[in-house]
Swiss-Prot record:
Catalytic reactions of this protein: L-cysteine + L-glutamate + ATP = gamma-L-glutamyl-L-cysteine + ADP + phosphate + H(+)
Biological process, per Gene Ontology: glutathione biosynthetic process
Molecular function (Gene Ontology), one example: metal ion binding
Coiled coil: none
Protein name stated in the entry: Glutamate--cysteine ligase
Entries under InterPro entries matching the protein: Gln_synth/guanido_kin_cat_dom, Glu_cys_ligase, Glut_cys_ligase
Annotated organism of origin: Pseudomonas aeruginosa (strain ATCC 15692 / DSM 22644 / CIP 104116 / JCM 14847 / LMG 12228 / 1C / PRS 101 / PAO1)
EC number of the protein: 6.3.2.2
Family of the protein in this entry: Belongs to the glutamate--cysteine ligase type 1 family. Type 1 subfamily.
Length: 527
């Protein structure tokens, strides 16, 4: 164990401080496509019974009208977070009228690009802005890529913990700057070690052959309708996904918060010639919010983001600049198609131990390690289960299995501390489940997906639809209690009323609204 990690764990293990570790906050966002009874993309509007996608706090859409997003409230106990997520699923599932929630991350058979419906948010200024932003995404990246779903895991350490560490380490940074620097250090370590999450939890080794739209690839054919790679863990996170020339040169620096803010601010204010050629309007209709490298900060695709809860009308980078980092959003997790919620307690508890390990371990600046971190990540998503696969560690080759076992040995100390804080051995058990996967790659979700498809002679689509139906049956057999159902019904109707009020009360024109929104980022100049 590194000196810094052992010192921090000893400090937090003291009787007076141990309860702090029960105050970490968790939130989960789960995306999933709506599909019809045959497993094809649902072309129906967002069910009104689920409420307004603009104003509902827990049920919205991501890119497409058919791409649902479920958002839990924050909880200190991740078991409660998963309970929240299950209740959202139960309610939504009861309102789908013969449609299903698609079980994996990679999409079902999709119609042609033109027919994939972009999410609608009504006629308010902000609703129209969200729609135009998505039109811009279609223009820049194509609609097909935007139909990939994932799980986002939001995690924060208790605010009371940072002053304790800052004082113990004699830092001269302000409390806010110390906290931000610590989260950025967590992100640097996440970049170093996130390949491990791809090995353990990647669950997208195969996809529907039509997804590539005829483009050449290195993928192999499993059957007439399915492409795959034999040792892949997460094709979702491979370079099949969100690769784009405009973003290729955009590598936000994780050396400190200000440089990260500056790089994103530059990207949302720097024109990109191919986008300039298209312009923001065609035949008087908006087609993208601007012609810059990024329309808004959230367009930047990354496996983890520093975050701060925003005020109404505030942009993410403004919130970070004004008040510092509050939590991290892990964005690289596949949906496990065997699980009704796409994630379970073992995975969540391991993520907590992993993120605490990243937060408390020594985290030097990445500098030359950046390319190694990217190469390791891409190697694991494409061939993570290949026997003897070698990664790069500080410029030297190391076998994945050797490095994974060493990391799990170190993460065991944070898992043990979490168990001491909460009582029981749940985190140790979650860690043991991951050790078993490192010892035997056949236990990983990606291997299990291919195993079941081969054993049953199923295409990707047939496997996924069967799992989707099984999950729907699970939710049907576990309906919400009447009181909970009524609470969700009220949340839906309240959100519809709120959207109606927004649309009634607005004035001004959309062009002026967009101009003001664009201008809001330009004041964030580094001091």
């Amino acid at each position: 164990m590194s000196d810094l990690l052992s010192r921090r764990l000893a400090l937090l293990g003291a009787a007076a401080n141990l309860p702090l570790l029960t105050e970490c906050l968790h939130g989960i966002e789960r995306e999933c496509l709506r599909v019809d009874s045959d497993g094809k993309l649902a072309l129906t509007p967002h069910p009104r019974a689920l409420g307004s996608t603009l104003t509902h706090p827990q049920i919205t859409t991501d890119y497409s009208e058919a791409l649902l997003e479920f958002i839990t409230p924050t909880e200190t106990d991740v078991a409660d977070t998963l309970g929240d997520l299950e209740r959202i699923h139960r309610f939504a599932s009861s309102k789908l009228d013969g449609e299903y929630l698609w079980s994996p991350s990679m999409p079902c058979e999709l119609p042609d690009e033109e027919s994939i419906p972009i999410a609608r948010y009504g006629s308010s200024m902000i609703g129209r802005l969200k729609y135009v932003y998505r039109k811009g995404l279609a223009l820049r990246y194509g609609k097909t890529m935007q139909c990939i779903a994932g799980i986002h895991y939001n995690f924060s350490l208790p605010e009371r913990l940072w002053p304790l560490l800052r004082q113990a380490e004699g830092s001269e940074l302000s409390e806010r700057d110390y906290q931000s620097a610590a989260y950025i250090a967590l992100i640097r370590n996440f970049r170093r070690y996130s390949w491990l999450l791809m090995y353990l939890f990647g669950a997208s080794p195969a996809l529907d052959a039509g997804f590539l739209r005829g483009r050449p690839s290195q993928l192999e054919r499993l059957d007439e309708h399915t492409l795959y790679l034999p040792y892949a863990t997460s094709l979702r996170m491979s370079d099949l996904g969100y690769q784009n020339n405009a973003q290729a040169g955009l590598t936000p620096c994780y050396n400190d918060l200000q440089s990260y803010i500056d790089s994103l601010r530059q990207a949302v204010s720097t024109p990109y010639p191919p986008y300039e050629k298209v312009g923001t309007k065609q035949d008087g209709e908006w087609v993208q919010l601007n012609t810059n490298i990024l329309q808004i900060e959230n367009e930047y695709y990354s496996s983890i983001r520093p975050k701060r809860v925003t005020y109404t009308g505030e942009r993410p980078v403004q919130a970070l600049a004004a008040r510092g980092v509050q939590y991290v959003e892990v964005r690289c997790l596949d949906i496990n198609p065997f699980l009704p919620l796409g994630i379970d307690l073992d995975e969540a508890r391991f993520l907590d131990a992993f993120l605490l390990f990243c937060a408390f371990s020594d985290s030097p600046l990445l500098n030359g390690e950046c390319s190694d971190a990217t190469d390791n990540f891409l190697a694991v998503v494409k061939e993570g289960r290949r026997p003897g696969l070698q990664l790069q560690r500080r410029g030297q080759p190391v076998e994945l299995q050797v490095w994974a076992n060493e990391l799990l040995e170190r993460i065991a100390d944070t898992a043990a501390l979490l168990d001491r804080a909460r009582g029981g051995e749940a985190h140790a058990a979650a860690l043991a489940a991951q050790r078993a996967k490192v010892a035997d790659a056949e236990l990983t979700p990606s291997a299990q997906v291919l195993k079941v498809m081969r054993e049953r002679g199923e295409s990707f689509e047939a496997f996924s639809l069967r799992q989707s139906r099984e999950h729907a049956e699970y939710f049907r057999q576990h309906p919400l209690a009447a009181e909970e159902q009524a609470r969700f019904e009220k949340m839906a109707s309240d959100s519809l009323a709120e959207q109606t009020e927004l649309e009634r009360d607005q004035d001004g024109d959309f062009d002026t609204f967009v101009a003001a929104y664009q201008a809001s980022i330009l004041g964030l100049i580094s001091n």
